[in-house]
């Protein structure tokens, strides 16, 4: 079987009732038929498998590629519908991830006794030059707001001059697009000012140096894998240690992984009602606050001890209690001195980094959309695609 048939069988097994609830087309009324969600979901899963992130490219393949034509089954689609569907159903995609993993738990493929978590920084759809300081943002917002008001006044005068005409001309697409672009720019700059205030409140010093992007206010400058600093978002995946299936997804504007483990444990409990017994993470996650929160809910953190080499250079044992350690962190240090847990930690790359590497290979390197909500939707499409391949490997899909 071609993998497009596997994709279709997987989609057929899903509960898509929430997608159908939003469709308002009926047989008794005139109008264009709505496109079945099975088609649009299959198109995006197939495109993600092929490393395609462009809605226009998918639309082109629906007309020229037999695989995509087979998925459409003679139904006409356009790039706008495909593009909107990618990001308009974040909650429903989250539900699909939850229900599909819950099914694997029921079948015994996934236990969630042990998870791995790792993050990757994905280039945002914003330029480095779009980051501005607060005074500049205020000035830009004033000009953008004045521009919107000027356009509204111009449209009002046009409407008044056309009142006496028997057949007044309707607003052109170009005028409507100009109005929409002006409003969206004003809204983005306003969001950038809000984000700038939040960042300034968090910083203890150099508050005046805080910059936010007018293109994507949710993007942050982050240090990337090649050593460069670029606008990006932080995509976090948590995966089951046995099945290597993604069980949790989070997207944020934080440039570090510190503090990301407790929210992921909460997410897993909310999704499946299970708290993992162990979490395999690198030392960036093993902050004292994170270890304390994880241990308090019954999850043992398995990681290298932060600053081990520095402590050894000063003649200290990193696996013994240090000044300012709490009881949970002392237990973590002593646990990681045991050979059993050091051997267990060696599994971390194959558990935590495998999903990241696979998604990178399928194009999760540069976002085409803006905002954390839409970025979460893209991350969920990649998670569902990765899990689909794992299900095929495990024999969970016939």
Where do the model's predicted regions map?
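Basic, short loop/linker segments at the boundary and entry of helix-turn-helix/winged-helix-like folds
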Residues: 1-45, 50
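Helical catalytic core of nucleic-acid polymerases
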Residues: 17-19, 26-32, 37, 61-74, ...
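Generic anion/oxyanion-binding catalytic loop in active/binding sites
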Residues: 47, 71, 250
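Anion-binding and metal-coordination hotspots
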Residues: 51-64, 75-398
